[in-house]
Amino acid sequence: MLALGKLLELTLAGREPAEKTQLTVDGVRMRWLSEGALEVRPPEARDNGLDLLLSAGIHGNETAPIELLDRLLHDIARGDLKPRARILFLFGNPEAMRRGERFVEQDVNRLFNGRHESSSGFEALRACELERLAASFFSQPDRQRLHYDLHTAIRGSKIEQFALYPWKDGRQHSRRELARLRAAGMEAVLLQNKPSIVFSAYTYDQLGAESFTLELGKARPFGQNQGVNVERLETRLKQIIDGSEPPAEQDSLDGLQLFSVAREVIKHSDSFHLHLPADIENFSELEVGYLLAEDIAQTRWVIEETGARIIFPNPKVKNGLRAGILIVPATADGLA
């Protein structure tokens, strides 16, 4: 196998490859761009016009997605998977990956869409570099642009595999992309309705890609992801890469639960208190009238929405950041 196929090994060791560019036996060009970043380019005659960005390790302890990208890259480097798409593989936070931690100083996935410009430290610099790499990759005109940012969660979930679909004013969510997610094993999709500062929101809003944050299960250390089933996603990614996807009309939204954001719970001060058990699962339902959280100046979050559920509750975030999202069921009306 070509040395550049071992991007994960190089990244965890903090090493640069001796050769920055290599060719597979069937003419696929692999080019190391910077730490944790590798571009894969098919022969021109085989290129189907898709630019696919696959990112993982934005949080360093979310290892199942990292291992998935590692397997795909190994298959390409060995010649077992023959891409027809251009692909950019990104490991988001190499230093946190080496430490086995979510982040070192600050959460990289809260530093996109310009947020890094008002911050400092190496993770702010990394967010800036990731934006630059993505912008360069998606700079070629007249090509399809698709970005999957792969994650696992710090807590359990009543719906284990789900996606978050970013929002941009004047742009509709795509039924075709939702059906593709369903075929990849996603059980639910959260249709967002306001700007965001995560990586997928940057590539969706600023670069025009169809972009998604994919949550694949619970975060576990390297080598301990037997309980995270990514078979359907891995199969669909291989089909996207080698151009063997079934016709779009064969995919459907059957069984896919749709949700929209009702409110975000923002932590304003150190007095913030979230009235939820520490081990509550994502997508847990909350009754109307339930006191969800309190903060300074008698700020109270009381459940008003029928069918409300909570995802990503985290009272330990920094002040000014989101400490949870209240979501409600949505319909497929308005999809493009």
UniProtKB/Swiss-Prot annotation:
Transforms N(2)-succinylglutamate into succinate and glutamate. GO terms for biological process: arginine catabolic process to glutamate; arginine catabolic process to succinate. Keywords: Arginine metabolism, Hydrolase, Metal-binding, Zinc. It comes from Pseudomonas fluorescens (strain ATCC BAA-477 / NRRL B-23932 / Pf-5). It holds the Pfam family AstE_AspA_hybrid. The keyword Isomerase does not apply. It catalyses: N-succinyl-L-glutamate + H2O = L-glutamate + succinate. Signal peptide: none annotated. NCBIfam families: arg_catab_astE, PRK05324.1. Its cofactor is Zn(2+). This is Succinylglutamate desuccinylase. PANTHER family: ASPARTOACYLASE, SUCCINYLGLUTAMATE DESUCCINYLASE. It comes from the Bacteria. Zn(2+) binds at residues 59, 62, 151. GO terms for molecular function: hydrolase activity, acting on ester bonds; succinylglutamate desuccinylase activity; zinc ion binding. Binds 1 zinc ion per subunit. Pathway: Amino-acid degradation; L-arginine degradation via AST pathway; L-glutamate and succinate from L-arginine: step 5/5. The active site is at 215.
